[in-house]
Amino acid sequence: MPASKQILQSWAANADNWIATIDNAELESRTLVTNHAIVSAIAAINPKTILDIGCGEGWLTRTLRTKGMQAYGVDAIAALVENAIAKDGRFYETASYSELAGGKKLMQPLFDAAVINFALIDKEETALLIESLPAYLVKKGWLFIQTLHPLAIAAATEYTSGWKEGSWNGMKRNFEQPYQWYFRTLEDWMQLFSVKYHVVAIKEPVHPETKKPMSVIFILQTK
């Protein structure tokens, strides 16, 4: 079975657990560091319209709307999108990364910015999505990506791009169907961005006590 299909099947099976996890603020890394980090990075640019890709149950979209942005969310998992709509109204729709890469029309044709927050897991679909996103953005549009910091992998295993074994260890709920995910080195991220984007800034949010990096945020602008 293709990795992309396994990833989608896992998220569909775990949608209810994920919704409950986010609703109850059960991920310390997010509540302590990374949620604020991505919101602050976007707020510093303050785009008028923004597309939240891989929005899940919609927490980030809702937060950005409270800050005056016209935020919209898309996700491949229908159950997550339905939950987001129930909480916040019809600012969400179902769309997979392959559909976006194929040019699927959304509720708004162009956005000032897009954000992908801890939602780049596959190899090929990630590359195709990032390559295709300028078609959804205005000229000199912004792309914000928050993902696992490369040092998190470097500290545990060899520092090479490739598929890594995933798990739901550490989650408070009974998640199932762990999947492999694709890790990229910093060099490979830069190569992926180089054709369509300028790298404007890189942020490295750290844990307030351990001072270890919790994520990396790439702030990009289309060429």
Give the location of each predicted region:
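Conserved class I S-adenosyl-L-methionine
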Residues: 1-45, 83, 144-171
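A short SAM/SAH-binding and catalytic strip from SAM-dependent methyltransferases
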Residues: 112-126
